Design a protein with these regions (language model features):
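N-terminal Rossmann-like NAD(P)+-binding subdomain of aldehyde/semialdehyde dehydrogenases
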Residues: 1-115
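Rossmann-like NAD(P) dinucleotide-binding subdomain of oxidoreductase/dehydrogenase enzymes
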Residues: 106-167
């Protein structure tokens, strides 16, 4: 997946216009390449994992600033470690999840036929993230969206402004 530029808007109209522009870019990117391969999905998930690991301390500090003062250990256990584990679990099962699934066929009407279903990516997935556990709730959705081959747009809570600025 190609990177889509990220900008921070300030007013409501500016935010709406920016989101519409990002959605337009996401749609164009999706229609240009609607079926990411296993390697592309794996690369996206590894980038997500690397981002979390490389920016762990900055994320913890931003969340603490948003909460007023949140325990570093709580953030590490409830947010960082669970997301990293989620990526690792998804990577472990991704190839199996991408395989076409067998479905039954009416033997009377279609004798000898075989049926398979390969769920396609849906396109762009939107996530509106609440203020509590913002990394866990946003990145868990991103993990699932990327594993399914989708693109994603995330709208962080206004109460998570330090973290939103970091992301």
């Amino acid at each position: 997946m190609s990177a889509v530029p990220i900008h921070a808007a300030t007013s409501s109209d500016a935010i709406r216009l920016e989101l519409e522009e990002v959605l337009k870019l996401q749609r164009a990117a999706y229609f240009a390449h609607p079926y990411p391969t296993f390697a592309e999905r794996k690369a996206d998930l590894l980038k997500l994992k690397a981002f979390i690991k490389d920016n762990r301390d900055a994320i913890v500090d931003a969340i603490s600033a948003d909460y007023g003062n949140r325990s570093r250990h709580e953030t590490l256990f409830a947010e960082i470690f669970s997301v990293v584990d989620g990526v690792e679990h998804t990577l472990k099962h991704l190839k199996t999840w991408m395989k076409p699934q067998r479905r039954g066929v009416d033997i009377k009407n279609f004798f000898g036929a075989k049926n398979r279903v390969a769920p396609p990516p849906l396109g762009i997935v939107g996530a509106i993230v609440p203020w509590n556990f913002p990394i866990n709730l946003s990145f868990s959705g991103l993990i699932a969206a990327f594993a399914a081959g989708n693109r994603s747009m995330v709208k962080m809570s206004e109460n998570s402004r330090h973290l939103a600025k970091l992301l």
